[in-house]
Amino acid sequence: MGYYALFYDVVDDFVERRAPFRTEHLKLADEANRRGELVLAGALAEPADGALIIFRGDDPNVASSFAKNDPYVQNGLVKNWEVRPWTVVVGGEARAGVSDTGGDA
């Protein structure tokens, strides 16, 4: 199992336009959380120009499937989205005894 970060780049008037789709978006997120796939999620602030959603799964499809089914994506509130593997170094299920080796963060 690994972690995957889903990044959303949203439209300029996202906050004003999201209301009709928010309940379904949150339902989708809650279901993914209950299945143990969605770990953390939230909008970026100041400015509200994106969102970050962290998933845990066997492959990046856990995150891309969410995005493809998200009402925010389907209704044009998300301009672009990207899934990237996330290497957890500290916290959660990270290996114990992390030291500064000068490598990746």
Name each model-derived stretch.
Residues 1-105:
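Conserved, structured core segments of small domains
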